[in-house]
Amino acid sequence: MSSELMFNYTFSWPAGPKDVILTGTFDDWRGTLPLVKTAKGNFEITMPVKLANKDDTFQFKFIVDGVWCVSDSYKKEHVSEGIENNFLQITDLVETQEVAGASRIPEAGGLLCGKPPRSAGPPSTSNRKKNKRNNKKRRSKLKKKSTKNNKKSNESLDDNEEEDGVTGTTTEDVTGTSREETPLAEPTNVSKEAPGNFHILPIDQSADTTKSNGIIGGPGPVLVPNPGEIKEFTEIRDVDARELNERLNKKEEVPEPVAGPIVESSVTEKSPALPQADDPIVETKEVAHNVQELTPQVEAVTPLINEPEPLPTPEAQISIPESSKVEPVEGSLQSKLVEKRESTEGVLDGSKKVENKAKKDEEVFTLDPIVNKAPKLPLTDEQTAEGRKSPAVSEEKEKKKKQEKGSKEVKRSETSKEKKPSAKEVKKQTVKASKKQTASPLSSSTEEPKKKKTGFFGKLKKLFK
């Protein structure tokens, strides 16, 4: 323990001034401790006073409204010429201490035997900060110390209380922690117990489950009635971790699925049968020969009298394949065509006949000609003989017929857009047509398909007459 003596003492100044400051040897006369104004108007402050020994004195002075002065209520001491200070001795400090249940020691100059109560001074910002720091230090120290070393813990508490006295606070104001308030456990005398006796909990082997107070909230130990029957208690397996990991992590090769043939059920279904006509159209040989003979005549027909001769357009030329061009005709065919051309010359002589013919031709070309609807004509012996003798010619005529049907449709679409010619133009066209027909067979070899058409219409007119 230190030899310093510490007492709490209350300094006061009567009411009147605005500001009072206490200074002395404790702060090297710097004037750092202001007095607190109470409700009565006077100024007071309670602070710990330290004395180095019994003969030591505590010197102090007041600064009232900025003036250094000495109080008449305290003892005065002349330090040097013209300088006075108030001072306190140990007797002055002991008289002010009032402790209930405490006894004084006469040999020690009236010092208290017990610890004096320490009244806290006025609250200040500096003291509050110090108190907070001290409380934190105290709690941290108490946590670190264990309960086994009781002597060390008691000494630390005494030191902390002394620190509280220095700052002007007491342990009464500070809320005590749980460890401070709880009493220490009394040490038990172990020597009284027998050396071989131990406290053992009773075990009930007949009970299926045992209940025990768990340590730190746990369920406690479990005693199994039949440990020999449980294989986990007896069997021990030695497993190589590497082999187990390799076996588990090994990826098995998955066989790729074989793609089988895809059957399209919806597409391959049988399409519904289309309704067929009861009497299918069958072309006889006689009808075919008749048509084959008439088709070259249709090709040789000149353009209509009342319509101008259409110029060949690139569309018409493209639509007609090369096979539709005039092929060299044998001598037998040329002689037959010349005979047919001579028979039709008499029909186209008069202008009246030509006009009537133009009207009839207009009616014919307004609708597509249908061969089946035309009245069947009796075949002559010459026509039947020609069909039997030249089967190759008939095949060529059929091909030409199919190709020229397309060219006819193109010509009709072009001629329908053009205007109808006047009467003068009709006469000119009739004269040109007559000149072309009277030409020699050699010079008109290139115009055979057009002249054949005139022969076809001429035959039709003869039959109707």
Curated annotation (Swiss-Prot):
Stretches the record annotates as X-DNA-binding: 160-161
SUPFAM superfamilies: E set domains
InterPro entries, alphabetized: AMPK1_CBM (IPR032640), CRP1_MDG1_kinase (IPR050827), Ig-like_fold (IPR013783), Ig_E-set (IPR014756)
Modified residues (Phosphothreonine): T182, T295, T366
Regions of compositional bias (Basic residues) in chain numbering: 127-151, 451-465
Skewed-composition ranges (Acidic residues): 156-165
One of the record's GO molecular function terms: DNA binding
Modified residues (Phosphoserine): S153, S156, S271, S319, S343, S394, S440
Keyword Secreted tagged: no
Region Disordered, annotated ranges: 107-227, 247-276, 298-465
Entry's Gene Ontology BP terms: signal transduction
Feature: compositional bias, Basic and acidic residues: 337-363, 385-398, 404-428
Modification after translation: Cleaved in the vicinity of position 160 to give an X-DNA-binding N-terminal subpeptide and a non-DNA-binding C-terminal subpeptide.
Skewed-composition ranges (Low complexity): 166-177
Key words of the record: DNA-binding, Phosphoprotein
CDD domains named in the record: E_set_AMPKbeta_like_N
Keyword DNA-binding: yes
GO cellular component: cytoplasm; nucleotide-activated protein kinase complex; nucleus
Known function: Cruciform DNA-binding protein which exerts an enhancing effect on the cleavage of cruciform DNA (X-DNA) by endonuclease VII from bacteriophage T4.
Family: Belongs to the CRP1/MDG1 family.
Record protein name field: Cruciform DNA-recognizing protein 1
Gene: CRP1
